[in-house]
Every structure is written in structure tokens, then in C-alpha cells.
Amino acid sequence: GLIYDRNGELIADNMPTFQLTLTKERVENLDATLAKLDELVGLSDEEIASFKKRMSRRQRPFESVPVLYRLTPEEIARVSVNNYALPGVEIEARLVRHYPNGELMAHALGSVRRINEEDAKTLDSVAYSGTDHLGKLGVEKFYEKQLLGTVGYQQVETDARGRVMKVLDSVPPRPGEDLTLHVDVGLQKAASEALGDRRGTVVALDPATGGILALVSKPSYDPNLFVTGIDYQSYAELRDSGDVPLFNRALQGQYEPGSTLKPFIALTGLMTGTTTPEFTIHDDPGWFKLPNNSRLYRDWNWKKDGRGGHGDVNLQKAIYRSCNVYFFDLAVKLGIDRIHENLALFGFGLNTAIDLPEARSGLLPSRDWKRATRGLPWYPGDTVNIGIGQGDMLVTPLQLATAVATLANRGKTVVPRMLKSGVELPEQAKAKQLDDVEQVPEQFWDLIFESMGMVVHRGNMGFGENGTAWAYIGRNIAYQMAGKSGTAQVVGIPQGEEYDEEELAERHRKHAWFVAFAPIEDPKIALAVLVENGGGGSAVASPVARKILDYYLLESRYKVAQLDD
């Protein structure tokens, strides 16, 4: 079956290629024939060994086996001219999977690859008798059964040499189902271009459906290289690259959420009555201490000379200025049990994705988890760290984007999915749906939305009062965006020392986060952006988010459709 994006653009096609095949029963001397083919098309030892493995897995006599995939016109000509001397050797036309967008869609789509020895042990030999390929990753893997189709057959009468004398019965093959995904190729391109050459990821969802509009992980790779088998050197370069292009950061990367967690902690405080919109702390000079404990938990603007802090801070200012001290204090008052219970409502610590088999669950720590994994009790300092999304908590970018979509929906949960139409969603999709986050007064949602809006739009209010992202993305914006920046620590900074990005090796710098949804009044898109080792989330990740939202809300087919309506 074929795969299309939400606008009908073909993103997984089947392309005709020519393969060199061999039927063992028609070959007098296999090694001599392979030697002759080596002269004509050049067969490596690896290719010959792979062919012999495929030959050993044949299901029936007179079944042709590919020797070489994707013949060039020159190779076809050389074999054709010498065909008289190569009984049992044929050039066969086959359809093979082709990804027209190459590396752009690799991590969103997954890929098909050649069936290997391990695969063959578990596959239905009849169902796969017409193909050498199998969905191995992502959507291609999850919907393999629906995309595969069914093989046809002919019942024939042959002579002693295997030549067909009469066709007794035949059933034509049936193609697999075509799928349409939620993903938008234009938005995918915009997200990829916004990230540029940096390592990172973007996940964007439609809050109304949970449909994944874009899923980018960079660097990427060309999935076409794997369809008919990648050579060892090319694979080794991808496998051993320090930038790990084969790693799907959007689904498998697990990172501290940093300050992107603060709106969820704030809502937990409001839901449980632990804080109020009016409650105010005085943050000066920018650190927090637990009772009977000398350790300083510092705000992000703390300085060694004693400067720092945010002055008087209520919940709204705590979000738009990203005040750590407010959330240290709130987390301790909440306690880990209530934090764990309420964050789980948004899907943290859970894998709720339907059709992305590589997605991971992140980690939402608890007392029980720490006791079971480390044999240690939960300490108050652990709770302090969770208050600003650090410590043991881990999220995947998909998971964080999904939580932001639930926030944008005022508590209506969604299940992230790639499939838009074409086949029925599996039964397990129903089990993935979380209960809605209910019994939250509208004024609490309004307060969180307004506070996240001020992260982006509050500017020109005097020193120290601008939203953390305003200077980077808040000017000349044509819609209302709710956002929150965050940084995830990669290495710890000793007590009493300032974080100096210039002094750190690039791979030790913080990861930059930005989450957002827009328009605030009627959210159409929610997203999470991560730039690995990028530094500050507002400075580095928020411009990426702005470019993506500008494209989707102001330039894309979505915008055209809105105007038509």
C-alpha cells in the first residue's frame, strides 16, 4: 500500500526496479555461474554470502532468489547480452519501496528493509512469498499487515525441466491498503529548516485529534539506503557517527523537561489548593534552602556577587519569568506524592502513542520507584529538583508535546497518532486513552494560558519584567502564542559556581527546550522543540518554534483552508 500525508502528497511509494535473480534448479554449476556474474556486474563477497543465505531460506523448488537488487542500465545490458550462457539467471522487474522525501521523513515514517534470517523464522512463508521486504520501523512496522496485501498464485503443470505446460488455476494478487497520515510534509520541511544543522527534534500535534503534524529528528538518514540492503561501510558511518542519525530523538530520546514542567507544577498547586493566584514569595537574592540544610538551590539568574532573584513573585510572574525559587517552594509544599499523581494525568511516565512502536515512556519518579531501583528513600531535595523539571524526571519530546496538547485542550486528553485514515485503528488504541483532567475551574486554565502567553508577549515593561521569550520571538507576531522555555542540565555545576556556557565543552552544554500552542483562544497546534546542547531555551529553541508556528498558521495549506471556510 501507499502512504500519503494529510494533504494527499505521496510520502511512501513503490518504484519499479530490475533485479538479478537465479533459480538453482536451472543452474548446472552454481559457483561457476556466480563467478560469471561477478565478471559482468561485480559481486562482492558480502553480496554472494547474502545471496546464499537467501537461497537457503527458499520455501519451494524453482523459486527464484535475488542475487543483486537495483541493476543499473549498463548492468542490465551486460547480463542481457550474455544471457544465452547463463541458464537459470533472469532479470526480473520488481516494485520496491521508495521514499521521495528521503531523510526528511525517515524518523516520522520508519522504513521497510530486507527480510533477514531472524525475520524469516517467524513470518508466514506464504504471505511473504511475493516480497523480500518487511516493515521494520515506525508506521511501516506498525501497519505492516495492512500495507502488505495478499499474494496471488498459479497452479501449473510442468515438465521434468520445470517448464510450465499448462495453467490449471490462478488467483491475482491484491495490493495492500493505502494510508493517509496526519503529518504535513510542508510543516515537516519548515520544522527541519528551522532546526537547521543542529542536533534536535520537533514534535507538533493537532490538539483536537492528537494527530502528529510533524515529527522531526536531526540529524537524519536516507531510508532508501536500507530498502534493498545498505553496504557495510555506509551503515558503519551512520552507526558510529557521534551525532547518531539513526537515533529517533523524538520518540526514544529521554531528557529532563526543565522549566517546561513549571506550568504543570503550577496547575497541580492550584488544583490541590496548595497555592493560589495571589500567593506571593519574595525571591531575593535568588536561592532556596530547605530547613536544617545548608545546600543552596539557585535561581537561574543567581550571581556569585549576591545579585539575582526576581523580587516579589506570584504564580503568574513565576511562569513568565521562570522563577525557580517559587517552584522549589511550591514543590516542597506539594510533596512528591501529589506531584506524581497529578503529572501522571497528563501522560508523564506513560507511553500513550498508538502507532509509533519505538516510543518510550520517559520517567516520572516516585517514592516506590526510587526504593525499587536504588534501595533508597525519597529525600526532600529530590522533590525540590522535580519542581523545576530536573533530577530523575525524564520525558520524550513526543510525550511533552502531547502533555502540552492536553494543556491547550483545557484537560481533554489526546492519544498521539500518525494514522488519519485508510484503516481502522487497533483495539489497543482505546486502552491508550487517558481520562480527561477534570474538575479544574476555568479560571485556573485561564491563569495558566495567560501566564504562558506573557512568556512570549509581555515586553517593554521595564527591566526584569519581560517574558523570558519576548526579546527573541515576541515582536511583530500576528497571533497569540502560549509558550514556555526550559533548559535541561547535561552536567552538574558545583555549589557556589556560576554556569558559564562558554567554558563548557559543546556536548556538556544544556539542552534547550521550548513548548508552545497557538492561537491561545482556539489552539490548532501544540509543539515541543528540543535543541541538544543548545543552551538557553528562550534564546535558542523559541525562534525555532516561532518559525514553525508562523508557517503553519500564516502560510500553510491549513491557513488557506481557514480562509476558504
Enumerate the predicted regions with their spans.
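Membrane-proximal periplasmic segments of bacterial cell-envelope enzymes
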Residues: 1-164, 171-172, 197-201, 207-208, ...
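Beta-lactam-recognizing serine transpeptidase/beta-lactamase-like catalytic domain environment
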Residues: 12, 158-168, 207-260, 264-528, ...
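Solvent-exposed, polar/charged alpha-helical surfaces in well-ordered, non-transmembrane soluble domains
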Residues: 18, 31-35, 39, 69, ...
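Second-shell loop/turn segments in exported
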Residues: 18-26, 34-38, 61-69, 94, ...
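Short beta-strand segments enriched in hydrophobic/aromatic residues
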Residues: 112, 407-408, 530-533
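A conserved hydrophobic secondary-structure block that centers on an alpha-helix together
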Residues: 165-211
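Gram-negative outer-membrane assembly/targeting C-terminal domains
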Residues: 551-565
